[in-house]
Every structure is written in C-alpha cells, then in structure tokens.
C-alpha cells in the first residue's frame, strides 16, 4: 500500500493523498446516505451505511486511503455519557463530568463492547476496499475528548477544563487516564477489525500552553502510540495535534507520522521533525474553492517536501461547500505532479 509505505518513509511512485473529513457534506452521495440514516449519530451506528460513506471518496475522488466514518465522541457516549448533536450547536453532553462520582460511573469495558458498530464498519470496508488502498482507523486524543466531556460541548475558552489544569490537576489526570485506557483498547479493536493505520486527532491541542500541552495532552497520546507500536509495529501511528507550531522542538516519541495543520509553516515542521517522521499535510482547506489556488498550494508543498517523506493532506478538514469537481482536481493534481 502506497500510503503505508509513505508512513514508514519507504519510497513511493508518487505522494499519497487523502483529506480529513473526506467522507462528508460536500459530497451529494454522502448527503443522500446521511438523510436515509436519519441523523449523524444514527449514521455512525449503522455499520453498513458508515462503511458506504467511508468508501465514497475512494470511488469518487481516487484518494489513496479511506478513513473510517465515525466521530471521536462515540467513546464517551458508549462509556455512559448522554450525547446529542444539536443543529447549529454541534455535540452536546447533557451530563458533563463534574465530580469523581461522574467519572466512576463511566464504564471502559462496556464502551469497548458497545463500539462494535465501528469494528463492523471497518471489517466490511476492508473487505470491499481495493487491496492497494489503506484503511485508517482513528480516535480523538484524551485531552480533546475530555474538553467536550467536561465543558458539555464545544467551547471558546475551555475555562472548565483549564480550571482543572491549574486548580485540580489530579482529577484531570484521572479523567485522562481512564479515557486513555479506553482508547488503547478501542484502537486495538479497530486494528483487529482491519485498520491498516491509525490517527489520533488532537483538535484542541492549542488550548494549552506548552508545558501543559506536554503534561495533559501529548503524554497521553504517546501512551496510546506506545501501546499500539509495541503490539502492532507494522501499523503506522499518525499524531495530529492542531496548532502546536511553537512546540515542535520538544515533539518526540514512538509514532510514525506527524500531521501538520495549515497554520504551521511546512518548512518549519520539516526542519524540526522531517528527519524523524513522515509529515502529513498541510494545504489550507480554503484553497479548494479555487483551481488556481489549488495549483499554487500543491506546487508549493510538493516543492518543500520533494526530498522528504510526505503524505499530502489538507491542514484541516474539507469544508462542506467545496465543489466536488475541485476536490477531484486536487487529488489528481497531487498524484500526477508528484510522480517520481
């Protein structure tokens, strides 16, 4: 698989390319399946439909990897939290974690069993996916998932979480440790079901100052990565901590690919991390609105990464109103222009 080879810094005939959120609302085919499922969570829980939308970008765009269709918050949901996706508001937990009793009620073992719809979707997708295409499993980072569990949803300033960082770090570490335990086994089950690589999304890494990022976020991601690499050395682990361009000097650990977001200069990431890791990213997603902007972005990134291990991706998820034609153009352009 060209994608897995690139993760391990092996030479590839061209630069493999996929997009975060590639199974998403910009695709009319996705919207059809989502409408038939009823709502977002029902789509996540229907393994046949989740598999169908996972495969759509491979068939329609020709990306080199599929990423399983799911959500990072299905883990706390199946641990016993009450999750709803409110229109215009995003995810909402009606019972956020406030006390040790709240935390004790969450059941790690039950969640691993209850998440069988994700493993079933992976198994079905791997069966249907072409042999040369990789299937990526994923989870959120413990820190990013915890922000939703503690705040009760998305947040502008993460005040409740950050209050714990400084006022009651011991309790926050207990929450993160419990989540880390669940995520290790969740990812292990994804690999058993057929995932060829795994990505850990730390979407809210940038909410923390440097010292606290390494204590409350990065440390736990590495714990998951270590667990996976020890058991499955042939499975690449991708870390994607968003907005940490100022912390790159201290990024180090047992993983294979570092995801670079669009706000981080790729030259900087290459200088600091390119020798150790394959870099993934990092085109500005809004370049996809315009074909000329796509060409300029692709040329610039391929030029920077021409002598380094690289997986092409956006620096964040594709937006819902991007024309499908432009997404196709982007994928084909990367594959053509990067031919060795």
Swiss-Prot record:
SUPFAM superfamilies, alphabetized: UROD/MetE-like
Site (Transition state stabilizer): 71
GO molecular function: uroporphyrinogen decarboxylase activity
The protein's annotated pathway: Porphyrin-containing compound metabolism; protoporphyrin-IX biosynthesis; coproporphyrinogen-III from 5-aminolevulinate: step 4/4
InterPro entries: UROD/MetE-like_sf, Uroporphyrinogen_deCO2ase_HemE, Uroporphyrinogen_deCOase
Record-stated family: Belongs to the uroporphyrinogen decarboxylase family.
Name of the protein in question: Uroporphyrinogen decarboxylase
